[in-house]
A protein has these predicted regions:
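P-loop NTPase motor core of the ASCE superfamily
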Residues: 91-95, 105, 279, 302-431
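P-loop NTPase motor domains
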Residues: 1-289, 391-416, 422-431
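Sensor-1/coupling segment of RecA-like P-loop NTPase cores
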Residues: 284-305
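A short beta-strand-to-loop transition that corresponds to the Sensor-1 phosphate-sensing loop
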Residues: 26-28, 294-298, 326-328
Length: 431
């Protein structure tokens, strides 16, 4: 992944209009160090934005004034699905999405349009806090503070909370709340996390990816999944969804702001892949987005998404592929089908002996044949079989070799075994 990253950072690095804007995700927490080195080499240090705890940037995933509450709530539901891989009952997640949408409406109305995970958590979980905010909303309403649209949102949200949500039986209410707290608790449990991802409005200095696309910035997430298992997945998935939404807006705006190329680089992609990625990868080429992903196997993707059709859509929308040694049968079979079959020459060799009379020799204690003859048969046939068999993927791909399925821009190059140069052994530059 490092050579690809270096080439993209280097590309037109001194040209403000052409240098590439990027989102780089890595849940192991070491990728950002290499990115910093590349940015220093190619004079792009001012373009680098590192999202990390106690860092220089504060990011609130919920502060999207241009997005409807229902869209934000749906993003949160999409992220919840990362932690509900085998959940066959969608009612609880659908209900949690509805509660979040209405809570976001209320929060925007009493908090001057600013929404944080801390506010969402308190307004949903703490009844006294909800009642206190209701008094503020009533006072603003009586003073004609809201326009017609805001008034409608206010009445619909209050109606939902008073007539439906708060009237649910205790068991149903507790289950819905537990679904919501799986996200909100990750942001309010520690002070460092709270001040980084739910800061006051005046402290926000990373507002999203519009600036990344307009000015060619490089956003890197530095958050180790072993230390912050849930939070790193949530932030990674949210950054990815935020980036994808902004990229696709370029098509709607007909590239009026900027037509620079952008890139999405993701190591350990299976940790935060979502079903919406299949649609993005199928359309992002027109939006001039380069997608570079690394995953352990296709089964890893399937384990996260739990939808084989979606996994196949994601795979088929990624044109260039490098396959390394694998023992995963699902991955191998899918690769074999994609590469196809060819006619192979198969030969068989047999030897047979016929005897008219066989007698037993007591002297040698064995059977002796008389008037026997020996015949040998060699046959050759053409059979259709996979170009690369299972043994090739499990045993014949050595370390630092891969099977390449690549395009030259106009056609697919015949798949072939490639020998790769390890980055840590190569002293030159990748360009």
């Amino acid at each position: 992944m490092y050579p690809f990253t270096q080439q993209l950072i280097k590309y037109k690095s001194n040209n403000f209009e052409k240098k590439i804007g990027m989102l780089i995700l890595d849940v192991k927490g070491n990728y950002y160090k290499q990115v910093k080195k590349f940015c220093k080499i190619y004079n792009r240090e001012e373009d680098l934005i590192i999202i990390e705890l106690n860092g220089n940037y504060k990011y609130n995933p919920l502060h999207k004034p241009n997005l409807k509450p229902s869209v934000l709530a749906n993003r949160l539901k999409t992220i919840l699905l990362l932690f509900s891989k085998n959940n066959t009952e969608s009612f609880w997640l659908d209900k949690a999405e509805q509660v979040l949408a209405e809570a976001i409406k209320l929060c925007r109305l009493y908090n001057d349009g600013y929404v944080t995970f801390n506010e969402l958590h308190k307004i949903i979980m703490v009844n006294d806090y909800y009642l206190d905010k209701l008094k503020i909303l009533r006072e603003k309403f009586n003073n004609n503070y809201y326009n017609h649209t805001e008034t409608y949102d206010l009445l619909s949200s209050i109606t939902f909370f008073e007539k439906e949500f708060l009237n649910l039986d205790p068991r149903t209410l507790s289950i819905i709340k537990s679904e919501i707290t799986r996200i909100t608790n990750s942001f309010i449990g520690e002070y460092d996390i709270l001040k980084t991802f739910s800061p006051p409005l005046e402290e926000l200095n990373f507002l999203g990816f519009q600036d990344v696309l307009e000015n060619g910035k490089i956003v890197v997430l530095n958050m180790n999944i072993s230390e912050y298992a849930i939070l790193s997945k949530i932030i990674s998935a949210y950054l990815k969804l935020d980036f994808q939404s902004e990229v696709m807006m370029r098509l709607a705006n007909n590239f009026q702001i900027s037509n620079r190329s952008v890139a999405f680089i993701s190591d350990e992609y299976h940790e935060y892949c979502t079903e919406t990625d299949s649609n993005f990868f199928s359309q992002s080429r027109e939006a001039k987005c380069i997608n570079i992903l690394a995953t352990q196997s296709y089964t890893s993707l399937l384990n996260t998404i739990n939808n084989q059709a979606t996994v196949k859509m994601i795979i088929q929308n990624l044109i260039n592929k490098l396959w390394f040694r694998s023992d995963d049968i699902f991955t191998i079979e899918d690769i074999q089908k994609q590469i196809g079959k060819e006619d192979k020459e198969k030969s068989s060799h047999s030897i047979s002996e016929n005897a008219q009379k066989t007698v037993f020799s007591y002297l040698t204690n064995s059977l002796n044949s008389k008037n026997s003859n020996i015949s040998e048969t060699i046959s050759t046939s053409i059979q259709t079989d996979f170009i690369y068999d299972t043994k090739f993927f499990t045993q014949e791909l050595e370390n630092f070799t891969a099977l390449g399925f690549l395009s030259d821009g106009s056609k697919i190059i015949p798949p072939q075994k490639l020998k790769l140069i390890p980055y840590f052994l190569y002293k030159g530059g990748f360009s």
